[in-house]
Amino acid sequence: MAVRIEMPSVGLSFTPDSKESIPIAIVTGGEYDGERLYLNDDSKGGKKPKKKLSFAKAKIDKMRSRDRADLEMKLQEAFHKGVAPEHLLIEGDGVRELYEEMLEEVKKDTSVELPPESQFQLIPSPKKDVREIWYIAGPSGSGKSYIAKGLAERYRRMFPDRPVYLVSKLKEDETLDAMKGGPPRRLDVQKLVDNPLKDLDLLADSMIILDDYDTFTKPFDKAVQKLIDDIATMGRHSNTTMLCLSHYLSNYAKTRLLLCEATHFVLYPAATGNHALNYLLQTYLGFDKDETAAIRKIKSRWVCIHKNFPQWVVSEHSANLLHHE
């Protein structure tokens, strides 16, 4: 009888395993071009049996049920604590090898690496009744508009009857105006000042892009901030997906509500100061120091983090699950 180890209830795969599987990115370039990366969710139970790790060591196979149960519990505890195999304090022939096998199996389900010629492109949720808030933060020229353009084009492809709106200080935007299917519909900021949008149903079932919203000055800044706050708090009822592009990872009091409600964060670690990155990841995403350091070490221009359970991180060439238990 094999030792049974409880595995993560979610995993990453290029093949959906149920109707609940959600595509979170698509591959462009190379032999995997066009492949979708899915988040396969078994957290509701019953979709597939828990994985079972077999190990040939006779002393483990022949353990008494009580001893085997004790070993399972200890290995599971070590797994949850993130104990490395070389630091495992559980004694017994073959125990460390079993633990290493367990970690290797987990890694297969929770991380994906792409070859250099391929890269991930982010995509919005295909579910009609899901609203998302994407906070895309980085300095000028980092590629914020390019990310927003890709998301908006995918949104249009998924929902051809839904409009995409743009609020921008610029009269022309070379990147966003070049969207496939034509430029987004511009909302007149002066009208937002004169007649604040009182009914969010006017933006129901739509996507709205707020380009460098933090650059607006009086009297437009308050009108734009009110629009953002209203969508953040009430947009879930109208299925309004919002992309907020900003130069700042956090503007403290001004962004507190938005960051609390955001579902996705797109960051540019190499172009971001340590203090700002640490503050955002640890305050709003619950990262510890080691996880924060790991984000900075990712070799990618951008990194996208899904805030809610299960947390995942996607960059240009890799994807990883975090806090998936």
How should each PLM-predicted stretch be described?
Residues 132-154, 169-171, 185-287:
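Conserved P-loop NTPase motor cores
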Residues 311-325:
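C-terminal helix/juxtamembrane-tail motif
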Residues 4-122:
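N-terminal pre-Walker A segment at the start of P-loop NTPase domains
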Residues 163-169:
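Conserved RecA-like ASCE P-loop NTPase motor core of nucleic-acid helicases/translocases
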Residues 2-13, 180, 248-311:
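Conserved ATP-driven motor cores of ASCE-family P-loop NTPases powering translocation/secretion/packaging/pilus
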Residues 153-163:
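Post-Walker A helix-loop "phosphate-sensing" segment adjacent to the P-loop in P-loop NTPases
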Residues 175-193, 319-321:
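Active-site regions of enzymes building and remodeling cell-envelope glycoconjugates
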